[in-house]
Amino acid sequence: MRFSIISASLVLIFANVKAFNEEEILEIFCGVPKKLVSRYNQCLIDHGPEIIKKNYEIINSCMKGHLGSETESAMEYVCNKKNVDISIKRCISDKISEEMKEFDRRARLEVWDVLYVCIFKA
């Protein structure tokens, strides 16, 4: 569950920046130590805005049936290239893109504030 929140926040960051392709995003994400991911996830759960929670629900719905209940199993699924299912990627991408259309500038700034706190001060 927590994995989904970090995924959603990373999608938000990289969707806004558009500086990285999918492969580079995956490489960055999969290089993060699991302990740090857990700490970051908890910070987002505690401080995250509504859009993070919506994206978390989207990712959960798209990956339903492919994951166990632990963060590690989710990371292993996503980071193992053998498990990449294009339909899951497409589901997440399409639904989050749709959600972002209604995401105003003020809400984007709120996400950046929370991400900054969770990355640098947690």
Curated annotation (Swiss-Prot):
Entry keyword Phosphoprotein: no
Tissues in which the UniProt entry reports expression: Expressed by the venom gland.
UniProt PTM comment: Contains 3 disulfide bonds.
Species annotation: Lychas mucronatus (Chinese swimming scorpion)
Keyword Secreted: yes
Keywords of this entry: Disulfide bond, Secreted, Signal
Signal peptide: 1-19
Name listed for the protein in its UniProt record: Venom protein 7.1
Primary residence: secreted
One of the record's GO cellular component terms: extracellular region
Compartments, as annotated in UniProt: Secreted
